[in-house]
Curated annotation (Swiss-Prot):
ATP binds at residues 162-167. GO terms for molecular function: ATP binding; ATP hydrolysis activity; identical protein binding; protein-exporting ATPase activity; proton-transporting ATP synthase activity, rotational mechanism. It catalyses: ATP + H2O + cellular proteinSide 1 = ADP + phosphate + cellular proteinSide 2. Changing residue 313 to A: Lack of ATPase activity. CDD domains: ATP-synt_F1_V1_A1_AB_FliI_N, ATPase_flagellum-secretory_path_III. It comes from Shigella flexneri. PANTHER family: ATP SYNTHASE, SPI-1 TYPE 3 SECRETION SYSTEM ATPASE. ATPase component of the type III secretion system (T3SS), also called injectisome, which is used to inject bacterial effector proteins into eukaryotic host cells. Acts as a molecular motor to provide the energy that is required for the export of proteins. Required for type III secretion apparatus (T3SA) formation, proper protein secretion, host cell invasion and virulence. May play a critical role in T3SS substrate recognition, disassembly of the effector/chaperone complex and unfolding of the effector in an ATP-dependent manner prior to secretion. Its main location: cytoplasm. The gene is sctN. Changing residue 287 to R: Reduces oligomerization. Lack of ATPase activity. Abolishes invasion and hemolysis phenotype. Low levels of secreted IpaC. This is Type 3 secretion system ATPase. Changing residue 165 to A: Lack of ATPase activity. Mutant is unable to form external MxiH/SctF needles and to restore the invasion phenotype in a knockout strain. Keywords: ATP-binding, Cytoplasm, Nucleotide-binding, Plasmid, Protein transport, Translocase, Transport, Virulence.
Length: 430
């Protein structure tokens, strides 16, 4: 090997700032993994980094992990490899870190051969996708009746802090009818990862679940990669013909990690501090789920943290425009103790009409109309204008309030079949 070629393959860092390294490496690609050695005389690998951009003839890398122990004598060596993750049935019941490695097991499952797959895959072509025509039943009354999901749909769960996103996600895992569940906890607190693992240990579905995590203390690139890894694992089980449910909590923290990486790579902020590349990257992740003609499906649920109780956040607006529907959680309903705190009038499933029959559509429309009338009556009551006995139609609506609220509430331990849900909504609107 020539001396010049050797220099292009090894480099010292020009700058180390937090998780970001700048170097003079030239023969590398975006997404490539580089090993970091302690020094030129040592082969010990002390860290790894991922190429995230190029700027002013410099290559910018983001550390996988932290920068503790690195120095000017640190040597950066390209590997010509990209991040891969473990996949396979042996992953069921496992906890997976942002490197795609199993770190723990919460269920004893089949120890079959572990395979490796790239994490940043292209979405399926339109010609490979199957139409969404079959309902994905969640066991949650308000969703299955008013916001019916379809196999292969992508739904957003939008809420401000403290509205019960994790509560709803646990209900979806416990009561929905998927074959495999892949849960990605992105940028969450370490306590929440511990609580989720403990929850899964006691779940009847633990042997069909995979948990991928990157807590808030992990580097930005780790948090991004954890979302890719969770999706790649779901894709593997889809190719095996399974009906997969994918949960990413939260998509907002994934987007913030993208923002941090992009800003560190020298991009300029645009919409609300987010560089343009963040909005380019979102569809590449969100378009990967779906139902395939070859068999198998990924039905995905993404939690989105709102800054307040509306959709003014540009990130939330962008995500809502990409997904196939959204479930809006209301702080007011949560404060009243109504769980799941779903605001049915602000929520929508864009495949609803494709997966339910005419009778179901009529009943759902009647319930929404009743719910809207109740909201109007609440305003009249708040102004002190309602007097029982003066208006028969208002009295009829008033007498329905407790029945409607009872339907919208649900104990997290209870799941309802489709038949039970439709019977209950029929009784409510009768």
């Amino acid at each position: 090997m020539s001396y010049t070629k050797l220099l292009t393959q090894l480099s010292f860092p020009n700058r180390i700032s937090g998780p970001i390294l700048e170097t003079s490496l030239s023969d590398v690609s975006i997404g490539e993994i580089c090993n970091i050695q302690a020094g030129i005389e040592s082969n010990e690998i002390v860290a790894r980094a991922q190429v995230v951009g190029f700027h002013d003839e410099k290559t910018i890398l983001s550390l996988i992990g932290n920068s503790r122990g690195l120095s000017r004598q640190t040597l950066i060596k390209p590997t010509a490899q990209f991040l891969h993750t473990q996949v396979g049935r042996g992953l069921l019941g496992a906890v997976v870190n942002p490197l795609g490695e199993v770190t723990d097991k919460f269920a004893v499952t089949d120890n079959s051969e572990i395979l490796y797959r790239p994490v940043d895959n292209a979405p399926p072509l339109y010609s490979e996708r199957a139409a969404i025509e079959k309902p994905f039943l969640t066991g949650i009354k308000v969703i299955d009746s008013l916001l019916t999901c379809g196999e292969g749909q992508r739904m957003g769960i939008f809420a401000s802090a403290g509205c019960g996103k994790t509560f709803l996600m646990n209900m979806l895992i416990e009561h929905s009818g998927a074959d495999i569940y892949v849960i990605g906890l992105i940028g969450e607190r370490g306590r929440e990862v511990t609580e989720t693992v403990d929850y899964l240990k006691n779940s009847e579905k633990k042997s069909r679940c995979v948990l991928v995590y990157a807590t808030s203390d992990y580097s930005s690139v780790d948090r991004c990669n954890a979302a890719y890894i969770a999706t790649a694992i779901a894709e593997f089980f889809r190719t095996e013909g399974h009906k997969v449910a994918l949960f990413i909590d939260s998509l907002t923290r994934y987007a913030r990690a993208l923002r941090d990486v992009a800003l560190a790579a020298g991009e300029s902020p645009a919409r609300r501090g987010y560089p343009v590349s963040v909005f380019d990257s979102l569809p590449r992740l969100l378009e990967r789920p779906g139902k395939l003609k070859a068999g198998g499906s990924i039905t995905a649920f993404y939690t989105v943290l709102l800054e307040d109780d509306d959709f003014a956040d540009p990130l939330a607006e962008e995500v809502r425009s990409i997904l196939d529907g959204h479930i809006y959680l209301s702080r007011n309903l949560a404060q009243k103790g109504q769980f799941p705190a779903i605001d049915s009038l602000k929520s929508i499933s864009r495949v609803f009409t494709q997966v339910v029959d005419e009778k179901h559509r009529i009943m759902a429309a009647a319930f929404r109309e009743l719910l809207s009338e109740i909201e109007e009556l609440r305003t009249i009551i708040d102004f002190g204008e309602y007097k029982p006995g003066e208006n028969a139609s208002q009295d009829k609506i008033y007498n329905k309030i407790s029945v409607v609220e009872s339907f919208l509430k649900q104990d997290y331990r209870l799941g309802f079949t489709y038949e039970q849900t439709m019977e209950l909504i029929g009784e409510t609107i009768r």
